[in-house]
Amino acid sequence: LWWRLDKKLTLEDCYYSAMLPLIDAIKRGTTTLIDHHASPFAARASLDKIAEAVKKAGLRASLCYEVSDRDGSKTARDGIDENVEFIKRCQEEKDENLKALFGLHASFTITDGTMEKASEEGRKLGAGFHVHTAEAASDQDYNEKNFSMRVVERLDKFRILGPKTI
């Protein structure tokens, strides 16, 4: 269900889809959020729109764009570029209320080539990674069948795991 909705998001939608849960967070007393965002056909500048909403709401957040090969190599590359640009901006701005991680959707939606490129770019920037890991048996099964290793082994192979990874 979510993947179909993600594909329809515009940059304006990204702002408002962030603002609603930010308002809810304020009502519930939450002060810091970690978001793993996806809008495959509006990836570029999507994190800036979400950051704009976070700043307006007055909360703290760690944001990333979830890289995936679900919609092809171009959208995966756009996701990598969005993470790189946003991480660099956060590092330059040094805003204590806004941080960035390098987002990866999940091992079963990322090719080896994309995983390698994302790992290389993230490590070059000293970034941590945010990745869904073995959330279902199907993720383990897919990795064992297609890569002859389990999810965590594959993430380790590409040096995704570390003290800054969630």
Language model feature labels by segment:
Residues 1-48:
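Metal-associated gating/positioning segment near the N- to mid-region
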